[in-house]
Amino acid sequence: RAGPRHILKRAIEIAKSKGFDSITISPEIEFYVFNQNVSKFTEIKANQGYFIAPSLDVAKEYRKKLSDILMDCGYPVKYHHHESGKSQHEIEISALSAIPAADFCSFFKYIARDIATRYTFDITFMPKPFSNEAGSGMHAHITMLKKGRNTFVDETDPFGLSQTARYFIGGILAHS
């Protein structure tokens, strides 16, 4: 009853009891790709940054294969590309309901590692494997709808944030 899946289900039930129609999440996962070798995670695959040219992006075929498999499994890949760190990559999927989005995150790590071995790559989801490179994160683009309206948006606010969005952010910070 204290597992993450149960906690998420409970949070969804609470949101519905407060009049929210749905919670959708679009996960965006960043990771580093390395050549497989004895001293793991030392050989960086590329030395260019964000959105490098395809001819220089030696892991693009890996990302494409991973994205194709994810789509075959029903996960709508929004995009994939090289990130700003050397050998850092990112895949984002389109918004899903909260529980399928959470399931995707677990599935993604498993399948990404499995496919990497076919390309003789190792990967890591460590937040900061190198002190001199960009850190990796897992961004969650979250939307909560009420009567079909995004409750996080307030066009009259200078930052476009509603009071609901501010409380939501505060809740994340308080419970992290």
Predicted feature residues:
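Glycine-rich, acidic/polar active-site loops that bind/position phosphate-bearing ligands
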Residues: R1-S176
